[in-house]
């Protein structure tokens, strides 16, 4: 702990500077509740991914803010790396009376609890691997949509009903949000447009040469 993370950061300094997010696995097999400790950037995708999975699992969980007392996180998230690292725990450190006492032993943990947490971590890793991210090929100002037959020829200046997102609005949102960082699920969350529709529009714009998948 701590010195191991520091040693690894020293040995893999160049490689770690290319990493955006990670997981610190700790206190994962106790009898207590599932905990989710966020990374140092509140709105980073790693936090959104974990939160979605925990909500979908219908497990009661406790959400903890980033805490400077997380010694490994301090190293990976240091100024030279700034890797957003989060944790899923079961009986989080400092949150149970047995912590760092003689009762914090093999009788306190169980394979069943460990397996529950392992399954959640596996889901998170799979979701990270499956993220679909697009980037606009014209990031400097707005693309001329009429050139690509994407702009309506009649009534283009008319504003649609306030509660209805027109197809054009959705195209504009996808183009605006596709910055090479947000996944299609992130765009869906931020625009309140169904993910399947965001993905369909993104693929359509990719074929039009306006977006590229990264």
Give the ranges of each region predicted by the language model.
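Short helix-to-turn junction characteristic of helix-turn-helix DNA-binding domains
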Residues: 177-178
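Short, glycine-/Ser/Thr-/acidic-enriched flexible segments
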Residues: 29-30, 91-95
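Ligand-binding cleft/hinge of the Venus flytrap
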Residues: 49-58
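Acidic/histidine-rich catalytic neighborhood of metal-dependent amide-processing enzymes
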Residues: 1-45, 58, 63-78
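A structural supersecondary motif
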Residues: 84-91
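Short alpha-helical segments that sit at the start of domains
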Residues: 139-172
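Alpha-helical metal-binding/catalytic segments enriched in His/Glu/Asp
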Residues: 1-3, 88, 120-121, 187
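His/Asp/Glu-rich mid-to-C-terminal helical/loop segments that flank catalytic regions of hydrolases
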Residues: 97-141, 182-185, 189-214
